[in-house]
């Protein structure tokens, strides 16, 4: 591993102590792995005992510029010494600067800031409803857009939806992913928007057919329906371009973003085309576009540009995919994805891969039961990729 972490040598708590305290005081909403992490640098994280792991989870596609990128760290430190938080009742230079930057890289007209992906999807849905006066949505099977009540309305997986039915918008039609004709049939006079992930993440790293999103765009134009892209997981270089929409040459009306936007610092946003915007009082976020978040986001974008991480994502993604496809295994169904958003579909539930990899210094996660999702920091090296593939080949 090339990313070296300096170990302080002083253990504040053992695994059992941390896990016991978590079990006692934290609502158990996650099926956590038995791992207590304390540090990170680049594509490597370290546990409290000093053991290092190549991180192919990256906070679930959050740490695109790597853990604790020095440019991001310095920006947060500098901003924290000047201004941490003020109400959005007032202007700040750094928010205005980041809004301009985000509008530029998205190619869209205006933005709204929030704090997470689910909030961004909620804002996109709310904007679609207020802009059209309609209340129904069309979404894809196997979609994931968040677990808050509104976002849950367009999230397909029954284990997330069923305990909370009916959601805020019960008028959601779910259709097969990558089936444009099904979308055409599902759109009604009350459909405000079609909501899609350009590549489905939680659903199994599902890449649509090449012409699918263009056809959906045409259908939306013909029917006067808005098109929302959920780029929460696919954004900021993950697939080899700023946003996955560029891979398919399709522009949405509204786009939701989060995860990698702040270089690891919590932030979310939506961007909208000309003519789509909330009016005063129609939506708000106390912490949205806060000074620390904007400082982190500007620094993250700076790092992506200066270190040519878009190009690196393409290069390392192609290398990783080739290496994974060449593994001497007969239980692999398919290796798919774009850039450094890669899914490895296995013939059976892949939990054992996750456990074996962790025990051998590699972090991966399972999605859709039988798909290994690999979304490492874009700064991962070929040597680290080789190490990951060696471990997975043995699992």
UniProtKB/Swiss-Prot annotation:
<dbReference type="GO" id="GO:0005737">
    <property type="term" value="C:cytoplasm"/>
</dbReference>
<dbReference type="GO" id="GO:0003992">
    <property type="term" value="F:N2-acetyl-L-ornithine:2-oxoglutarate 5-aminotransferase activity"/>
</dbReference>
<keyword id="KW-0808">Transferase</keyword>
<dbReference type="InterPro" id="IPR049704">
    <property type="entry name" value="Aminotrans_3_PPA_site"/>
</dbReference>
<dbReference type="InterPro" id="IPR004636">
    <property type="entry name" value="AcOrn/SuccOrn_fam"/>
</dbReference>
<feature type="binding site">
    <location>
        <position position="286"/>
    </location>
    <ligand>
        <name>pyridoxal 5'-phosphate</name>
    </ligand>
</feature>
<feature type="modified residue" description="N6-(pyridoxal phosphate)lysine">
    <location>
        <position position="259"/>
    </location>
</feature>
<feature type="binding site">
    <location>
        <position position="285"/>
    </location>
    <ligand>
        <name>N(2)-acetyl-L-ornithine</name>
    </ligand>
</feature>
<dbReference type="InterPro" id="IPR015421">
    <property type="entry name" value="PyrdxlP-dep_Trfase_major"/>
</dbReference>
<dbReference type="InterPro" id="IPR050103">
    <property type="entry name" value="Class-III_PLP-dep_AT"/>
</dbReference>
<protein>
    <recommendedName>
        <fullName>Acetylornithine aminotransferase</fullName>
        <ecNumber>2.6.1.11</ecNumber>
    </recommendedName>
</protein>
<keyword id="KW-0663">Pyridoxal phosphate</keyword>
<dbReference type="GO" id="GO:0042802">
    <property type="term" value="F:identical protein binding"/>
</dbReference>
<comment type="pathway">
    <text>Amino-acid biosynthesis; L-arginine biosynthesis; N(2)-acetyl-L-ornithine from L-glutamate: step 4/4.</text>
</comment>
<keyword id="KW-0032">Aminotransferase</keyword>
<keyword id="KW-0963">Cytoplasm</keyword>
<dbReference type="Pfam" id="PF00202">
    <property type="entry name" value="Aminotran_3"/>
</dbReference>
<dbReference type="GO" id="GO:0030170">
    <property type="term" value="F:pyridoxal phosphate binding"/>
</dbReference>
<comment type="similarity">
    <text>Belongs to the class-III pyridoxal-phosphate-dependent aminotransferase family. ArgD subfamily.</text>
</comment>
<keyword id="KW-0055">Arginine biosynthesis</keyword>
<feature type="binding site">
    <location>
        <begin position="230"/>
        <end position="233"/>
    </location>
    <ligand>
        <name>pyridoxal 5'-phosphate</name>
    </ligand>
</feature>
<dbReference type="GO" id="GO:0006526">
    <property type="term" value="P:L-arginine biosynthetic process"/>
</dbReference>
<comment type="subunit">
    <text>Homodimer.</text>
</comment>
<feature type="binding site">
    <location>
        <position position="144"/>
    </location>
    <ligand>
        <name>pyridoxal 5'-phosphate</name>
    </ligand>
</feature>
<feature type="binding site">
    <location>
        <position position="147"/>
    </location>
    <ligand>
        <name>N(2)-acetyl-L-ornithine</name>
    </ligand>
</feature>
<keyword id="KW-0028">Amino-acid biosynthesis</keyword>
<dbReference type="InterPro" id="IPR015422">
    <property type="entry name" value="PyrdxlP-dep_Trfase_small"/>
</dbReference>
<dbReference type="InterPro" id="IPR015424">
    <property type="entry name" value="PyrdxlP-dep_Trfase"/>
</dbReference>
<feature type="binding site">
    <location>
        <begin position="117"/>
        <end position="118"/>
    </location>
    <ligand>
        <name>pyridoxal 5'-phosphate</name>
    </ligand>
</feature>
<dbReference type="InterPro" id="IPR005814">
    <property type="entry name" value="Aminotrans_3"/>
</dbReference>
